[in-house]
Design a protein with these regions (language model features):
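Conserved ABC ATPase "signature" region
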Residues: 101, 152-169, 278
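Conserved ABC ATPase signature
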Residues: 174-178, 182
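ABC ATPase NBD coupling module
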Residues: 43-47, 102-118, 144, 150-151, ...
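P-loop NTP-binding/switch modules centered on Walker-like glycine-rich loops
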Residues: 197-200, 204-208, 212-291
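Short catalytic/signature loops enriched in Gly
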Residues: 10-25, 38-45, 261-377
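Conserved ABC transporter NBD signature motif
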Residues: 93-101
Length: 381
């Protein structure tokens, strides 16, 4: 598998932008919350507060697609990834995998699912055991899960090394003998060794040299295309996310503030925070019209005591009194493409306040409301 056989844009465009309406999500997250306790006092440690790292997150991931998760450092995206793989225990909420809630599953119940949900970590230097050979590292998941591929584990590991662009002769080498990009390829080989259905990639290229990043992204896209793996791709670089992901969710201070398909979000962002993030992405075309850079005032509030109402209001140029008293729901607004959800009382794009008539209601909720109105009309008659 060659790194340069395809560009990232070309590979990403191979995936359809529309899904069959009957397709069930592979992963469904509802109200996912993770609060880390803050301990204080001596000699008895007691909880004096909580860091609200993730605070009520909702999204879905469909088979074979890539969902990008973006936001500033500290927004909760990496914590979300570790919750999905159950490296962290959720405080509240549900994580449904293939329709089964795994948010409270114990180790025995998670055992058959572990092989189907894998993770690629950010730091290729810290995520590989320096005392193990490449062969031992990649075959580790097979040994843990009792899997013996045809021809044996060594043969399969050598095949995986070729798939990720390394030589089968690297089987007996140690991690310190490889560059950062090569180490991340080893991490990719380990993640796909069990042929999972879902991979959570936590900033897989941010620690790599810029010249290597595109090669690793190309590799991940080719793996996704050939093996049909769904990805949750966590990153802060919106340009890379645009190339890799078919849908993108934007997080701010533990909340998803906007989620949409790639083209809809990048071409018509509705949340002010998304608009500000995109304004900072460098333009590749020097002849293109320069978009105005939006500079956010102030610092990100503390996740220990986040603002009331809309969490972005303390830095938002459109904030009004309503933003401090009412938390905006994540809904589809009129004029948005299907599935483009925004949590804002006063969305961008020149629109006015998101009134009730502007909100495109979920069909199921709309039917329930119509039935209720019909029943009221009959009773009045």
């Amino acid at each position: 598998m060659s790194d340069n056989s395809k560009t990232t844009t070309a590979v990403a465009d191979d995936f359809p932008q529309q899904r069959d309406g009957d397709t069930a999500p592979l992963l469904k997250v509802s109200g996912l919350t993770k609060h880390f306790p803050i301990k204080g006092g001596f000699p008895i440690k007691r909880t004096v507060g909580h860091v609200k790292a993730v605070d009520g997150v909702d999204f879905e991931v469909y088979p074979g697609e890539s969902l990008g998760l973006v936001g500033e450092s500290g927004c909760g995206k990496s914590t979300t990834g570790r919750l999905l793989t159950r490296l962290y225990e959720p405080t509240q909420g549900t994580i449904e995998y293939k329709g089964q809630d795994i948010s409270r599953a114990n180790r025995r119940q998670l055992a058959p699912i572990r092989s189907e949900i894998q993770m690629i970590f950010q730091d290729p230097y810290a995520s590989l055991n320096p005392r193990q050979t490449v062969g031992t590292i990649i075959s580790g998941p097979m040994e843990i899960n009792g899997i013996n591929p045809p021809g044996g584990r060594e043969k399969r590991v050598r095949e995986l090394l070729e798939i990720v662009g390394l030589s089968p002769e690297h089987y007996n080498r140690f991690p310190h003998e490889f560059s950062g990009g090569q180490r991340q390829r080893i991490g990719v080989a380990r993640a796909v060794a069990l042929e999972p259905k879902l991979i959570v990639a936590d900033e897989p290229v941010s620690a790599l040299d810029v010249s290597i990043q595109a090669q690793v992204v190309n590799l991940l896209q080719e793996v996704q295309r050939e093996m049909g793996i769904a990805f949750v791709f966590i990153a802060h670089d919106l340009a890379i996310v645009r190339h890799f992901s078919q849908r993108v969710a934007v997080m701010y201070l533990g909340k998803v503030v906007e989620i949409a398909d790639r083209d809809s979000l990048y071409n018509r962002p509705r949340h002010p925070y998304t608009h500000a993030l995109l304004s900072a992405v460098p333009e590749a075309d020097l002849d293109a019209d320069k978009r105005e850079r939006i500079r956010l005032e102030g610092d990100v509030p503390s996740p220990i005591s986040p603002p009331s109402g809309c969490r972005f209001r303390t830095r938002c140029w459109k904030a009004q009194d309503k933003c401090a008293t009412e938390e905006p729901p994540l809904v589809q607004l009129s004029g948005n493409r299907q599935g483009h959800l925004t949590a804002c009382h006063f969305p961008e794009d020149g629109s006015t306040e998101a009134r009730a008539e502007d909100i495109v209601m979920d069909p199921g909720l709309k039917a329930m409301e119509d039935d209720a109105e019909g029943g009221a009309a009959v009773s009045k008659g």
